[in-house]
Amino acid sequence: MDLTITTLEGKDAGKVKLNEEIFGLDPRDDILQRVVRWQLARRQQGSHKAQGRGDVSRTGAKMYKQKGTGRARHHSARAPQFRGGGQAHGPVVRSHDHDLPKKVRALGLRHALSAKAKASDLIIIDDLAATEAKTKQLVSQFAKLGLENALVIGGAEIDVNFQRAASNIPNIDVLPVQGINVYDILRRGKLVLSKAAVEALEERFK
């Protein structure tokens, strides 16, 4: 698959041949869903907690005698059916993380990249560098490229001026290539890769 390389100014800078095993797969929604679900589960805090009958601050003594009152048999007022009692089967502090094989995670990333390429939402930029950290200038350049909602992936290190200029632009995320992930790719409209990012990804999936 051949794709045109552009500069930040919108000029052509040649072509690049993309690896079909990374950018030319037929995307599978089930694989993408599994990876996104795994990512969000790892991110979920899990600090929710409700007091059970063993946690509430009430006496554990029997409410009244077993027989002779004509009332229902009860033990402690901590039981869930009473006002001020503990919650039955309430949430507890836990991790929502679950396992996902490394091969499935790698496959998910390749399918996400292929999905963007197939939808013509993949743009290759020659170099992600800015002469000065000016947001206004970068917004103008992005407008020429039609980037209003995009994930921008640079090389192993992002140019400091470019990072600062892009940090104030809404709906634009900038990550180094080692931070690329399925969730961030899918949540943004366009995917922008630098030439260095393409080379790093192809090296990673060799």
UniProtKB/Swiss-Prot annotation:
* One GO process term, biological-process aspect: translation
InterPro entries cross-referenced by the UniProt entry = Ribosomal_uL4, Ribosomal_uL4-like, Ribosomal_uL4_dom_sf
Gene3D superfamilies per the UniProt record, alphabetical: 3.40.1370.10
GO CC terms: ribonucleoprotein complex; ribosome
Q: What are the Basic residues biased-composition ranges?
A: 66-77
Is RNA-binding among this UniProt entry's keywords?
A: yes
Which family is it part of? Belongs to the universal ribosomal protein uL4 family.
Q: How does it assemble?
A: Part of the 50S ribosomal subunit.
What function does this protein fulfil? Answer: One of the primary rRNA binding proteins, this protein initially binds near the 5'-end of the 23S rRNA. It is important during the early stages of 50S assembly. It makes multiple contacts with different domains of the 23S rRNA in the assembled 50S subunit and ribosome.
Protein name in UniProt: Large ribosomal subunit protein uL4
